Amino acid sequence: MFIKICGIKTPEELEIVENYGNATGVILECSSKRRIGFETAKNLVNLSNIPVFAVSTTSKVSVWENIIELTGTNYLQMHSDIDQKAIDFIKNEYGCFIMKSFKIPEKSESPENDAEKIISDIESYEVDRILLDTGKGCGQTHDHRISQIIAKKFEIVLAGGLDPDNVFEIVKVVNPFGVDVSSGVENNNSKDEELIKRFCENVKLGENYEM
């Protein structure tokens, strides 16, 4: 299963993440406490042996162009209502791999209806990967009855409040293509190798679980 460990800030964190994850991410141009500058991000992109996603809440093409040109990454993670025309321009101009986030409510009165609306939204976009999240890196879990329905139709990456203690059960229920974690594997605002190791072990247990 694809495992992305997001929100790295230092070469030391990158080194840990590379030992366990398939991809990582740097937070740029948003209000997150994990936000770093372009120079730091460029250094991490250059050092990395795995894909480094530039993560941002911007919907402005000019800002994405800055991110691409100043960091050198070819991987973008978009947490905004950016339109398809802008995405097409970025893909045609820069050839980037784009993962687009779609917001899932924390609790649903009607999971089937909510899933249907989100599926319709997803189908209005053409992107390389779909991310289901509770909303802009808030660190809260969402209603996994919805993501379970969506995961039967699309290859999705699951995010939102994942940690070593809950990821086994969530992966087992939702059966996503991949998972994306940040705060759930941190201790004192830094990536913790023991938490990352346990998280990845439990992802694999959930993936291989047979009813």
UniProtKB/Swiss-Prot annotation:
Its EC number is 5.3.1.24. InterPro entries: Aldolase_TIM, PRAI_dom, RibuloseP-bd_barrel, TrpF_fam. GO terms for biological process: L-tryptophan biosynthetic process. Keywords: Amino-acid biosynthesis, Aromatic amino acid biosynthesis, Isomerase, Tryptophan biosynthesis. It is an enzyme of class 5 (isomerase). It catalyses: N-(5-phospho-beta-D-ribosyl)anthranilate = 1-(2-carboxyphenylamino)-1-deoxy-D-ribulose 5-phosphate. Belongs to the TrpF family. This is N-(5'-phosphoribosyl)anthranilate isomerase.
